[in-house]
Design a protein with these regions (language model features):
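Cytosolic ligand/metal-binding cores
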Residues: 100
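N-terminal beta1-alpha1 cap of cysteine-dependent amidohydrolase-like domains
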Residues: 1-95, 103-111, 115-147, 155, ...
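Active-site-proximal beta-strand elements of phosphoester/diester hydrolases
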Residues: 213-216
C-alpha cells in the first residue's frame, strides 16, 4: 500500500485533514500525518492542506499588508517538508494555503487580502460556492471540462505566478465582460497570463514539468459532505493518486 504524507499536526476542527484521509483511504492509500520532513521516507507523495495562519509575506519580499496570524516557525516546517518532496521528485497536491505555499516556494507571491474576499471567505453557516473556468490543456480541464463550480474559503490568492507554473483554474468577478474572460483564458492557456488579480483570481496551478499542482478551493471538504451543484472532489484525488 502506497503512503502519502499529509503535512500537519494537532486538532482538526474544520475536517481539513480528515477529508484528505477519507479520500486517500477510498483509493487504497495510507495517510500519514506529520510536519517532519524525515517522515516522507517511504512515502510516495505529499499533500499540503489548507488552514491558517497566512504565509509570512517576508518570504516573497513584501511587508505585512493584510496577512493574518503569520507564524514564521510554521512556515519553516511547511517549506522544509515541501523542499524534501521536491528533492525526491514526489507528487505534491497543495490545497488552499498549501497551494499558496507551493507558489511562494517556487518564487511567486500572494495577494495578501482580496478586495473580493467576501465572495471567497469562509462562512460557518453555509458552504460558499462559485464557478471557475478551467484552462484547456491542464489537469483541471481534463477532470471537469470548461467550468467547475467549487467551494471557497480564503481571503488570499496567488498574485505573481511562480515561473515554472501554469494556471489551471480562474475565477472571474461578474464585473469582467465575457469577452475579456475569454481573452484571459486564452492568455492562461498560452502561458502569458502570469498574475492573479482581485477580480481575476487564480484558483488552480500546475508545475510545467514536475508532478506538483495546487488548488485554492477545498476538494477534501466535499469528500465527506458533498455540496449540491459542485464538482466531484474525488476526481482531484484520483488524479493525484495517478501521479504516485
Amino acid at each position: 500500500m502506497k503512503r502519502v504524507l499529509i503535512a500537519g499536526t494537532g486538532p482538526d476542527p474544520h475536517h481539513i485533514y480528515s477529508g484528505c484521509v477519507l479520500a486517500l483511504e477510498a483509493l487504497g492509500l495510507e495517510a500519514v500525518q506529520s510536519m517532519e520532513a524525515e517522515d516522507l521516507e517511504g512515502c510516495s507523495g505529499l499533500i499540503l492542506p489548507g488552514g491558517v495562519p497566512d504565509v509570512d509575506p517576508a518570504r516573497y519580499g513584501e511587508p505585512l499588508a493584510g496577512s493574518l496570524d503569520v507564524t514564521p516557525e510554521l512556515d519553516e516546517q511547511y517549506f522544509s517538508v515541501l523542499a524534501r518532496a521536491v528533492e525526491q521528485n514526489l507528487p505534491v497536491l497543495g490545497i488552499c494555503r498549501g497551494c499558496q505555499v507551493i507558489n511562494v516556494y517556487f518564487g511567486g507571491s500572494l495577494i495578501q487580502d482580496l478586495e473580493t474576499a467576501d465572495i471567497h471567505r469562509f462562512d460557518p453557516k453555509k458552504e460558499v460556492v462559485h464557478d471557475t473556468a478551467c484552462i484547456p490543456g491542464t489537469f483541471a480541464y481534463d477532470l471537469y471540462g470548461a467550468h467547475a463550480p467549487v467551494n471557497t474559503k480564503h481571503h488570499q490568492a496567488v498574485r505573481r505566478l511562480a515561473p515554472e507554473f501554469g494556471i489551471a483554474q480562474l475565477w472571474f468577478d461578474d464585473s469582467i465582460p465575457r469577452e475579456t474572460q475569454t481573452e484571459l483564458i486564452a492568455q492562461a492557456q498560452a502561458g502569458t497570463l502570469t498574475e492573479g488579480a482581485h477580480r481575476c483570481v487564480i484558483e488552480g496551478i500546475c508545475h510545467r514539468t514536475r508532478p506538483i499542482f495546487g488548488l485554492q478551493w477545498h476538494p477534501e471538504l466535499l469528500v465527506d459532505k458533498p455540496v449540491e451543484g459542485t464538482v466531484n472532489p474525488m476526481a482531484v484525488f484520483r488524479h493525484f493518486a495517478s501521479l504516485l
